[in-house]
Amino acid sequence: MVFGSKVIKAGNGEPDAFETQIGQAILELEMNSDLKPQLRDLYITRAREVEFNNKKAIIIYVPVPKQKAFQKVQTRLVRELEKKFSGKHVVFIAERRILPKPMRGRRDPNKQKRPRSRTLTAVYDAILEDLVFPAEVVGKRIRVKLDGSQLIKVHLDKNQQTTIEHKVDTFASVYKKLTGRDVTFEFPENYL
């Protein structure tokens, strides 16, 4: 089994050096740990490194059908990969596609209606959910400032505060890099 087999790119493209390195790390984890049965059928589509505030984070893209399987082992996988890549934060995001908005006046009878899961809003919301996993988004407030800019306040599950609080800056930076939207994360008290 070659290292690249853990990285299967769309259009049969060749993985770059960084993606091969990530694929090799996942393959080593599969060979050495008790995660072998869960990791056997899993692969990634691409990986990239983003820099923010003199820190680095690794974004690993996984195919949407394999996302549930990845999430079952994600906490252990993230812990092991962060050890391997000297403390860089690792996030898993499903590889989703945004279809363009249908234009008025242009008639294309063969074209299918655009599914909700391919809209910009749905994809951006799903990216947010993927980023903060295993925590859950329990609420969201969008504050529109007078100059028209938006600030999204995301309320996360208070029970997960201890596990992900140290990564909140990473989540905000990665989300800004991927979507261009400012976001802040909060852990509000549970109101009954």
UniProtKB/Swiss-Prot annotation:
InterPro entries referenced in this protein's UniProt entry, alphabetically: Ribosomal_eS7 (IPR000554), Ribosomal_eS7_CS (IPR047861)
Signal peptide location: none
GO cellular component, one term: small-subunit processome
Keyword field: Ribonucleoprotein, Ribosomal protein
GO biological processes: ribosomal small subunit biogenesis; rRNA processing; translation
Record-linked Pfam families: Ribosomal_S7e
Gene Ontology MF terms in the entry: structural constituent of ribosome
Domain of life: Eukaryota
PANTHER family cross-referenced by the UniProt entry: 40S RIBOSOMAL PROTEIN S7 (PTHR11278), SMALL RIBOSOMAL SUBUNIT PROTEIN ES7 (PTHR11278:SF0)
Similarity annotation: Belongs to the eukaryotic ribosomal protein eS7 family.
Protein name (database record): Small ribosomal subunit protein eS7
Species the sequence originates in: Anopheles gambiae (African malaria mosquito)
Gene that encodes the chain: RpS7
